Amino acid sequence: PLLIHGGGLGIKEKLDELNIESKFIMGLRVTDEKMIKIVEDVMVEFNKKIIKALEKKSCKAKSITIKENNIIHVEQESKELGYVGKPIKVNTNLLNDIIQKDFIPIITPMGLDQKGQSYNINADTAAGAIARSLRSRRLLLVTDVDGVLDKNEKLVSEIRSYEAEKLIDNQTIHGGMIPKIKTCIEAVNNGVRGVVII
């Protein structure tokens, strides 16, 4: 197993503390030059907390951040999103090496471009890219929402890719669920046998 964590709540708290307003486009946080450093600091700190918590439970965990063992190479998602990256390559050799040594990789959803510039990556997008690259059997997305809701706001317990795409097109799926569901679709269309949102 491996764990890719987000940092949305911690990032929001830090930005609020500094009176910096967040903007979102299609569920993705617009990240400017000032914000990327804050995002990185919050992610690294949260990563350390997860490692400590796991070690207290006698679990061997290895930190994966852009400072230590960067595994995600990115390109800019779009100019309007700023320092938001789209994964283009995952270093699976490093991940497999860590896993074979019986460590659980704890991964921050950030990556570096060819010039070494750091980029924020939506955690679900990063998880999907890693799952596809490793040809994982399952991708579990843990979230604070119930899951996919239909137009009557009833929970959809199972959905096919084409049905999910229709729900995005007609805006039944919106906001932060868009990148989550797009990740699910890309994962199952690229070799991951199943995706579960819990």
Question: Model-predicted segments: where are they?
Answer:
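Nucleotide/pyrophosphate-binding catalytic subdomain
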Residues: 1-197
